[in-house]
C-alpha cells in the first residue's frame, strides 16, 4: 500500500486466520511486530482476541474481538485526524465516520498507511477496492465509493474514497527551470 497525509479513505480486510494478531494503521516510519502493534502515538491497531485498540503501547476498550471470516472496515480521515473501525458493517464505539463522531483514534498528524501484524503465520485478505469477494470467499456486493471507484463488501461511509491510486490527487510537477 501507500501512505496518505490528507483525504478520507476506506478499505476492508477479511480475517483469514487472525488469532492474537493486530490490524489497523501505522505511521509511515513505524515498525510493527505481532507482539508490539500500535506502539507510537500515530499508530492504532485492533487486537484480535480482545477488540481493544492499542496505541502508544497500551490497550483501551474500543470494540469487540474479531474471528476468522469477519470483515473489518477501516475509515481513515486524515483531514480531521480520525480513524474508525467496523466489524461486519457495524462501527465500533457507535462511531460514524460520515459525521465525524466517536472515532477510535484522533490526532493523526503524519503520513499513515494501512498495516497489520499477523502472529504465527496468521493472515488477512485486504480489499482496497479491487475484490469484494476476498478471493472468492464472499459473494460480491458491488459497493463503490462516491466516484464509482472500487468494489467493496460494505458501502464506504459518505465522503470516503477507495484507497487506490486513481483517487490520489494529480501531483504538481514544477518545470525544469522553476
Tell what function each PLM region has.
Residues 1-178:
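PRY/SPRY (B30.2) beta-sandwich protein-interaction domains
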Amino acid at each position: 500500500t501507500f501512505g496518505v497525509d490528507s483525504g478520507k479513505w476506506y478499505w476492508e480486510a477479511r480475517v483469514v486466520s487472525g488469532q492474537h494478531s493486530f490490524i489497523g494503521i501505522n505511521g509511515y516510519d513505524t515498525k510493527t511486530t505481532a507482539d508490539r502493534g500500535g506502539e507510537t502515538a500515530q499508530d492504532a491497531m485492533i487486537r484480535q482476541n480482545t477488540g481493544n485498540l492499542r496505541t502508544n503501547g497500551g490497550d483501551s476498550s474500543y470494540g469487540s474481538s474479531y474471528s476468522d471470516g469477519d470483515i473489518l472496515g477501516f475509515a481513515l480521515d486524515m483531514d480531521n485526524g480520525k480513524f474508525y473501525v467496523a466489524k461486519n458493517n457495524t462501527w465500533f464505539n457507535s462511531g460514524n465516520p460520515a459525521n465525524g463522531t466517536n472515532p477510535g483514534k484522533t490526532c493523526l498528524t503524519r503520513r499513515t498507511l494501512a498495516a497489520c501484524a499477523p502472529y504465527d503465520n496468521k493472515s488477512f485478505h485486504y480489499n482496497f477496492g479491487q475484490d469484494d469477494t476476498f478471493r472468492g470467499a464472499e459473494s460480491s456486493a458491488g459497493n463503490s465509493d462516491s466516484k464509482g471507484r472500487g468494489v467493496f463488501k460494505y458501502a464506504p461511509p459518505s465522503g470516503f474514497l477507495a484507497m487506490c491510486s486513481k483517487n490520489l490527487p494529480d501531483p504538481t510537477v514544477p518545470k525544469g527551470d522553476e
